[in-house]
């Protein structure tokens, strides 16, 4: 669909242990959006309730929701992602999020654990929060079994997403990565559907621009 050129209203979700929320908000502001950094509090049950209500209000008033990365809970397996998904599975928050994406044609994006949460909520690849099961894609431990931090080469495989509207298929970008659970896995039928729908946005590639499973270029062993 065409992307509106109006001034966007962005909601950047913040919780304990987050990083990159302020530079993300700065990037949105530079692009012409009006970002708000929303702090999620969970010290008391009343704080949790108030934070859910504030999140619903912010989503309803925004065109974009951005989930930054972080190391909540010491970044234990699924640590930060579990914290994020718990909030977004709240009934009112889930309803507001699905309405943003399916009715109001809003956008979501996630960095690091934020993207991990988006996958575990079913937002990628299904476009709405669902009750996921063992057949759904997930992000898990790097195949090498440890954290990876390096520069990788990524090729644009599809520019159907509004986030990639100004790129061209075949463009290669050098991207800094740093993660321990960045391996995207999905069953064959889901992968085939992603290919058919143009939902594989980027691929790790070698120096010749070819998609590869070589650990020297594909740092986590993603499918």
List the predicted regions and their residue ranges.
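Conserved structural-core and active-site-/substrate-pathway-adjacent residues in large, well-folded domains
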Residues: 10, 84, 112-113, 154, ...
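Short helix/loop capping segments that flank catalytic or ligand/cofactor-binding pockets
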Residues: 20-23, 75-76, 118-120, 164-165, ...
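Amide-donor transfer/coupling interface in amidating biosynthetic enzymes
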Residues: 29, 34, 50, 54-57, ...
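Glycine-rich phosphate/diphosphate-binding loop of Rossmann-like nucleotide-binding domains
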Residues: 11-26
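Short, glycine-/Ser/Thr-/acidic-enriched flexible segments
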Residues: 15-18, 42, 71-72, 180-182, ...
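Flexible gly/pro-rich beta->alpha loop and the following alpha-helix that scaffold active-site loops
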Residues: 27-31, 35-109, 115-129, 133-134
């Amino acid at each position: 669909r065409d992307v509106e050129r109006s001034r966007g209203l962005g909601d950047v979700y913040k919780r304990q242990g987050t990083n990159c929320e302020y530079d993300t908000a700065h990037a949105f502001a530079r692009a012409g959006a009006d970002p708000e950094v929303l702090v999620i509090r969970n010290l008391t049950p009343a704080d949790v309730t108030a934070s859910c209500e504030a999140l619903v209000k912010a989503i309803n008033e925004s065109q974009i929701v951005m989930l930054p990365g972080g190391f909540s809970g010491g970044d234990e397996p699924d640590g930060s992602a579990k914290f994020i998904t718990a909030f977004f599975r709240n009934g009112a928050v889930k309803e507001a999020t699905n309405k943003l994406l399916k009715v109001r044609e809003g956008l979501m994006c996630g960095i690091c654990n934020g993207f991990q949460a988006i996958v575990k909520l079913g937002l990628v690849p299904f476009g709405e929060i669902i009750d996921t099961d063992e057949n759904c894609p997930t992000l898990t431990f790097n195949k090498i079994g440890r954290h990876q931090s390096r520069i990788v080469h990524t090729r644009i495989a599809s520019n159907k997403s509004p986030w990639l509207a100004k790129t061209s298929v075949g463009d290669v970008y050098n991207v800094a990565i740093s993660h321990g659970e960045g391996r995207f896995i999905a069953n064959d039928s889901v992968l085939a559907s992603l290919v058919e729908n143009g939902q594989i946005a980027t691929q790790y590639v070698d120096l010749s621009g070819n998609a590869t499973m070589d650990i020297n270029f594909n740092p986590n062993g993603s499918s």
